[in-house]
A protein has these predicted regions:
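Active-site neighborhood of HAD-like aspartate-dependent phosphohydrolases
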Residues: 1-22
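Helix-loop "lid/cap" segments that line or gate small-molecule binding pockets
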Residues: 5-11, 31-49
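A short, structured active-site edge motif that brings together acidic residues
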Residues: 23-27, 52-56, 113-127
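Metal-dependent phosphoesterase signature
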Residues: 40-81
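Short, acidic loop-to-helix structural element flanking the phosphoryl-transfer center
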Residues: 64-95, 105, 128-131
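Conserved phosphate-coupling serine/threonine residues in phosphotransfer and NTP-handling enzymes
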Residues: 97-99
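Conserved Lys-Pro-Asp/Glu-containing loop-to-beta segment of HAD-superfamily phosphomonoesterases
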Residues: 128-155
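Acidic, Mg2+-coordinating phosphoryl-transfer loop and its flanking beta/alpha structural elements
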Residues: 146-186
Length: 189
């Protein structure tokens, strides 16, 4: 839904829509603002200066369209039970996401999972900085942590902080299914 929303905010022709959607799917964990800048300059070849006002307009347009398009998003099968089991077993659950906190909180409340999450790190902090903060501030041993992600950039992040990675393969375009050095799942059942 997010990839389609990115394509929609640019009113791109079909060929460019596919490029925009593919870019989003491959770079899922990149910040929204950075995706918009990339789409303007690299996919649409926009040569003029892309100022903050234009970027903010696109971000706001994205928010409106995404809110409308995402009302029917469902959880990945079994993830709610999985989160509750982790919590019951005294595991600490953090969310590190390129999405804004209000979106994350919306889904946590919708599926009654807010109380199971210790802390959310959203688009306001770089994912690498967030992971370092989580590991350092809690004296976590890297080998006792696991990161669930759905993009190559999530996998790269885990390599940088030396944390195990589990690919959640809900996105066929992410190219994670071609990698061999980590756990892969399609759902949490």
């Amino acid at each position: 839904i997010k990839g389609i929303t990115f394509a929609d905010i640019f009113n791109a022709e079909q060929k460019l829509k596919k490029k925009i959607i593919n870019y989003h799917l491959i770079n899922g964990s990149q910040k929204r603002v950075d995706k918009i800048k990339y789409i303007f300059s690299k996919i649409l070849n926009y040569k003029s200066n892309i100022n903050e006002k234009i970027i903010n307009e696109k971000v706001n347009e994205f928010k409106k369209i995404y809110k409308k398009n995402s009302k029917d998003i469902n959880l990945i099968d079994g993830v709610d039970y999985f989160i509750k089991c982790l919590f019951k077993n005294k595991s600490k659950i953090y969310i590190v996401s390129a999405a804004p906190k209000y979106e994350i909180n919306y889904y946590l409340r919708k599926y009654r999972l807010s109380s199971f999450v210790k802390k959310i790190y959203d688009s306001k902090i770089d994912k690498l900085d967030a992971m370092k903060k989580i590991l350092t501030n809690n004296n976590f041993q890297n080998e006792k942590c696991i990161y669930f992600g759905d993009s190559i950039s999530d996998w790269d992040l885990c390599n940088k902080v030396k944390v195990d990675f589990c690919a959640v393969l809900t996105n066929k375009k992410s190219k994670l299914n071609k990698k061999k050095s980590f756990i892969k799942i399609y759902d949490f059942l």
